[in-house]
Amino acid sequence: MIGLIEGRVCHLSAPVACLMTASGVGYEVELPLPDFCQLQLEAMASLWTHLHVREDAQLLYGFLHPTERDVFRQLIRVNGVGAKMALAMMSTFSATELKHCIDTENDAALTRVPGIGKKTAQRLLIELKGKFDHIQSDMSLLTEVEQQIGIAANSEGVILAEVESALISLGYRDKEAQQAIKAARETDAGQQLVDTQSLLKLTLKQLSNF
């Protein structure tokens, strides 16, 4: 089992990062979008990983904090929740926000995640009750020192396409992704668009308000 990968971030294509280890092996890892946005091209990174084996592929999912990985593993144990849906949940909510949704039985909030309807949300509330009690409400799930994000894409069109592609890969509909991107770009910060990660962060905030 591959539990932790440390290496240089040699490629970023939301929501997948490729880390080149000291042994010369490059690992492709899919991350929740908030974690992806913390990575910097050519910088060193450490990711806690979960290996997901399918008949046709072996996929690595990565997280900046081991508690996030624990949350992911709890999510995929729920009947009807696969790795893609779990990743979409962790791209929509932080671990502490997910805990709050479960503790307060807020199924309406959970239905904001692509692919989660009323029945699935209620199943999540039942099967996850008490599973996140080890998560403290004031806990930070990011690394101790967050890296500055400053990765310039080739053009504005490339940035927009990458952000939309990342959202669609998580299950958001084309129109929903485009509306969120449009709303993000209309903010003061969005008008100073410089890179894919920054726009992803803004767009995720907009989606949480929809």
From Swiss-Prot:
InterPro entries: DNA_helicase_Holl-junc_RuvA_I (IPR013849), Hlx-hairpin-Hlx_DNA-bd_motif (IPR003583), NA-bd_OB-fold (IPR012340), RuvA (IPR000085), RuvA_2-like (IPR010994), RuvA_C (IPR011114), RuvA_C_sf (IPR036267)
Function: The RuvA-RuvB-RuvC complex processes Holliday junction (HJ) DNA during genetic recombination and DNA repair, while the RuvA-RuvB complex plays an important role in the rescue of blocked DNA replication forks via replication fork reversal (RFR). RuvA specifically binds to HJ cruciform DNA, conferring on it an open structure. The RuvB hexamer acts as an ATP-dependent pump, pulling dsDNA into and through the RuvAB complex. HJ branch migration allows RuvC to scan DNA until it finds its consensus sequence, where it cleaves and resolves the cruciform DNA.
GO molecular-function term, one example from the UniProt record: four-way junction helicase activity
Region: Domain II, residue numbers: 65-143
Gene Ontology biological-process entries: DNA recombination; DNA repair
Domain I as annotated region, ranges: 1-64
One Pfam family hit: RuvA_C
Subcellular location: Cytoplasm
Family: Belongs to the RuvA family.
Annotated spans, Domain III: 155-210
Subunit text: Homotetramer. Forms an RuvA(8)-RuvB(12)-Holliday junction (HJ) complex. HJ DNA is sandwiched between 2 RuvA tetramers; dsDNA enters through RuvA and exits via RuvB. An RuvB hexamer assembles on each DNA strand where it exits the tetramer. Each RuvB hexamer is contacted by two RuvA subunits (via domain III) on 2 adjacent RuvB subunits; this complex drives branch migration. In the full resolvosome a probable DNA-RuvA(4)-RuvB(12)-RuvC(2) complex forms which resolves the HJ.
Region annotated Flexible linker, chain positions: 144-154
The organism of origin for this protein: Psychrobacter sp. (strain PRwf-1)
Record-given protein name: Holliday junction branch migration complex subunit RuvA
Keywords per UniProt: Cytoplasm, DNA damage, DNA recombination, DNA repair, DNA-binding
One GO CC term on file: cytoplasm
Domain comment, as recorded: Has three domains with a flexible linker between the domains II and III and assumes an 'L' shape. Domain III is highly mobile and contacts RuvB.
